[in-house]
């Protein structure tokens, strides 16, 4: 089968791919040399590179209810090109898509920013239950959304929101939505460029909610798609090449993550914004995805008193670098110190309906204040 990779309605690459295998064999047939600058910034234009890029345009294996979702659509993880044929590789991250050669669809008619989503697929993605859906086009962002937790995109009042549940199955699970909601308040108090989060209950599940921060003008690209090896040192070097604005944003993230004890900052949940009309990186992306922060997995014994909580906190480490406080102290600037001062008397604003227990919330609040004092060398 022959396919065409497009940005908007501009054809960029024509390729053939075998469809009867989990590892399609790719052959590049044609490239648009005049528009080479508009190829995805994370695409290496070789058969293997295109294969890697295409894998990112299908639902990940660790996504909640992935097998139920695909089965109801007559699809299978072992046939990725069949998934792409149905969802056209459309994403809410950017304006690239993949169509079968000869398909006359236009981006205006199928893109996920402007056109309705399938509510049936949203419910399937979130609950694992629903009716079978068999059609030549499945208009849904669920096929290109990453992450393990149950989640789905919903269009409400003309805006697009991500609804995301928490972990399940044990006494210390399910707190991720609270962490998203409260961490966003800390970011706001500091003046950190981060996405606001709300709380809502949908399908009987407590969810964090946030508005989509991409559109047809600006795309999001995770830093892990641009820097594939070398760890945080390589990321910093990449940011330094892009300028002070990016370095400052990286440092701000490290300080913020130290305050909230974010144990799940990884190379997929921070990155850059790309101007879709020029295909150039224009700014750091806002921070998001803070569910694994503010001691969300601490068991009941850790909340007995401050000493028990601090003993638990001592066991927490960042995902991709050495330690929270030491790393943050090393990048502190006068501007970041000023942001931390806003936390010295920080108080959470309670949600009107959904909140952590009062004792737990106040203990988290005191730890936020204390971690700010430690970073400011007041302790």
Features from the language model and the residues they span:
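Conserved protein-kinase catalytic-loop segment immediately C-terminal to the catalytic Asp
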Residues: 266, 271-273
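Phosphate/dinucleotide-binding and metal-coordinating scaffold of catalytic cores
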Residues: 1-255, 259-261, 273-379
